[in-house]
């Protein structure tokens, strides 16, 4: 009885730019036409047509360097998913602003901010290098 090795114990074929010549051929089990072509390969290569040379290349390698270096379209999926999540987040924020959050407090009104700024100036808050240091108390205007 002969022990047969399993496929996972054999070397595997991988197309890689940094390892251009894999240890095994791309096609492991040749068809009858491929076997005939491999026999024809042993003779002079000048007798082979261009299509036969390409077929021999495809038996040995899955992709050429140009095909390996070709860019993928994965970026479209990534950009599409990012735009979907950004749009979903924007819709969620708009719905929260409309239905969850209440109105802004009165302290955000321009009149209230002006009154608070005037009060801080009257109290001379941080007179050394803060808000009060930028106010001219004699002319009642901001320093230039």
Swiss-Prot record:
CDD domains: Cyt_c_Oxidase_IV. Residues 1-73 are mitochondrial matrix. SUPFAM superfamilies: Mitochondrial cytochrome c oxidase subunit IV (SSF81406). GO terms for biological process: mitochondrial electron transport, cytochrome c to oxygen. Gene3D superfamilies: Cytochrome c oxidase subunit IV. Residues 100-144 are mitochondrial intermembrane. This is Cytochrome c oxidase subunit 4 isoform 1, mitochondrial. It comes from Pithecia pithecia (White-faced saki).
